[in-house]
Regions:
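A short, conserved alpha-helix within the catalytic core of class I
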Residues: 126-138
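Gly/Ala-rich phosphate-binding loop of Rossmann-like dinucleotide-binding domains
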Residues: 54-55
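Class I (Rossmann-like) S-adenosyl-L-methionine-dependent methyltransferase catalytic domain
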Residues: 1-35, 46-49, 62-97, 101-111, ...
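A conserved beta-strand element that flanks and buttresses the S-adenosyl-L-methionine
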Residues: 119
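Short amphipathic alpha-helical interaction patches enriched in hydrophobic/aromatic residues
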Residues: 12, 122-123
Length: 218
């Protein structure tokens, strides 16, 4: 967690993308959301994907450890916000969006009121193997039954490059979510040709995948 804060303080945020993620645009309808419903974006940073969701009349709840990221999101998008304290979080709130500044693992279900979907572009792959299992367990505990998750992952030979982002295979996704979620692979491709950083490190492949998961009743 200290490293995450440090990266924002020193602007080492190579994972941040200025453009809206094309997979979110393509698969947005898979959430089956209607106007005014709410989506949760864990470890949200200052992603412009949240602005895209707002423009689709979808409400957003996010959680982020760094207040720098949250403040930059609002300032760069010229959005005013109100600041308050809610439990262990500083809550930054504007029209249609609530961003909790604090630890994801401190979130409870009441913080995610009316959330119908989860968008995980770079949360699971930002965590090491030990934390990934804890992350999925906690996420499952705090979201409602039938909530859908759009999950984006990377997979590559982990011994050829240290994370983050960490390698997460389809097998691991199945193991992590097995029993609590139905899941479907929507997309999977080896995209090493478009990853010069991985090429320079001698990585053999970079598999990018998109999954749709739905929490089921036990």
């Amino acid at each position: 967690m200290t490293d995450w804060i440090s990266r924002w303080e020193t602007n080492r945020i190579g994972w941040h993308a200025e453009q809206v993620n094309r997979h979110l645009v393509k698969y947005l309808d898979r959430f089956n959301l209607t106007t005014g419903e709410t989506i949760f974006v864990p470890l949200c940073g200052k992603t412009n994907d949240m602005l895209f969701l707002l423009e689709q009349d979808i409400k957003v709840i996010g959680v982020e450890l760094s207040d720098i990221a949250i403040k930059q999101f609002f300032s760069e998008n010229k959005l005013d916000y109100a600041l308050s304290k809610v439990d262990n979080f500083a809550l930054y709130e504007s029209a249609g969006i609530k961003l909790y500044c604090g630890d994801f693992f401190d979130l409870e279900s009441n913080h995610l009121e009316n959330v119908r979907a989860v968008y995980d572009r770079a949360s699971l792959i930002a965590l090491n193997e030990d934390l990934r299992q804890k992350y999925v367990k906690h996420l499952s505990d705090i979201i409602d039954f039938d909530a859908r998750i759009l999950l984006l992952t990377l997979n590559y030979p982990q011994h050829q490059r240290s994370g983050p982002p960490f390698a997460v295979s389809k097998k691991e996704v199945d193991q992590l979510f097995n029993g609590s979620f139905d899941f479907q692979e929507l997309y999977c491709i080896d995209d090493i040709e478009n990853e010069p950083m991985f090429q320079n490190l001698g990585v053999d492949f970079v598999e990018k995948a998109v999954y749709l998961l739905q929490k089921v009743r036990m």
